[in-house]
Amino acid sequence: MNRGVLESSPVQHLTAAGNPNWWNNVSRGLRPPTPLMSHEPPSTTAFIPSLLPNFFSSPTSSSSSSPSFPPPNSNPNFSSWLEMSDLPLDQPWSLSQLLLGGLMMGEEEKMEMMNHHHHQNQHQSYQAKRIQNWEEQVLRHQASMKQESSNNNSYGIMSSPNSPPNKSCATIINTNEDNNNNIHSGLNLSECNSSEMIGSSFANKKPKLQVPSSQSTLKVRKEKLGGRIASLHQLVSPFGKTDTASVLSEAIGYIRFLHSQIEALSLPYFGTPSRNNMMHQHAQRNMNGIFPEDPGQLVNEYCMKRGVSLSSTDNQKSNPNEEPMKDLRSRGLCLVPISCTLQVGSDNGADYWAPAFGTTLQ
């Protein structure tokens, strides 16, 4: 036992003060005070369990042989011990130390115990702050990972060959932490692994291939072609048909119709038989064209017939004895034959076109 503790024990204090009645009080035990006493000292069972709640599982029963302690106010060291609330009571004090001076320890031991208790409180508060900081870092990391995954959702992520695909966050965590830190490190490891699994799933996705320049030009050409087909549809306007094939077929028929009209208007100015033969051959080639069902070939057939009639009129002119044909067609008054008007009642009337505004058919 410490020497300073023995020197400050209550036995030596009472004997040094010259109190011969102390042993009589110990032998007699606790007796009720006389009516003349104004202050009643507390019993052993009254203040020992209150001072030492962590050392005795049940309250100690008072007996005649148990020593009685002096009142708390009789010794200043004892009163100062009772008033201190920050001294720890979790040390394994023995009963002899408590009775012979454990409660009256020296100032150095008191300061040492207070410093130890203060260091423990600081360590616990530091660990709690560190755990809170780790939680904030994990939350920020998760938020950043979610933002990166949402940004790279439509483009894909390519992992660099130098960095490993699955980098664990367990190396950051100190392995010498206490049990709370170990549990928290396990939570961090699971959260980091889950976030890395999300990142690896995005990394495994193949990035979108860059569109080559040829495809972009084809797209522009398709857009231009679509606009041209729309303009052709406005010109030819097939009856209830909007598909591309019908629009192109109507446009081809319309072009052939215009070509035949030009030929019909220019034939009177070419009276040579060689020219008539050329027109007849051209009309025959059109009859054997790629589109035999195309309605524009009817006009070509008419041109062929008209070429034959013109050749006959030329022959009649060459033979003045023969009587010329007396009809409107021979005089050039009817450029569009009546047979073309029969196509109005057919399914496809692309070859019949209304005259322009202010003009009439001759």
UniProtKB/Swiss-Prot annotation:
Supply the alphabetized keyword list: DNA-binding, Nucleus, Transcription, Transcription regulation
Which InterPro entries does the record associate with it?
A: bHLH95_bHLH, bHLH_dom, HLH_DNA-bd_sf, IND-like
Where does it reside? Answer: Nucleus
GO-annotated cellular components: nucleus
Respond yes or no to whether keyword Cytoplasm is given for this record. Answer: no
Using the record's annotation, list all stretches that form the bHLH domain: 209-258
Q: Please name the CDD domains in this protein's record.
A: bHLH_AtbHLH_like
Recall the GO molecular function terms of this protein's record: DNA binding; DNA-binding transcription factor activity; protein dimerization activity
Has keyword Ion transport? no
The Swiss-Prot or TrEMBL record describes its family as follows: Belongs to the bHLH protein family.
State whether it acts alone or in a complex, and with which partners, per the record.
Homodimer.
Identification of the protein by name? Transcription factor bHLH133
- Organism equals Arabidopsis thaliana (Mouse-ear cress)
Gene (UniProt): BHLH133
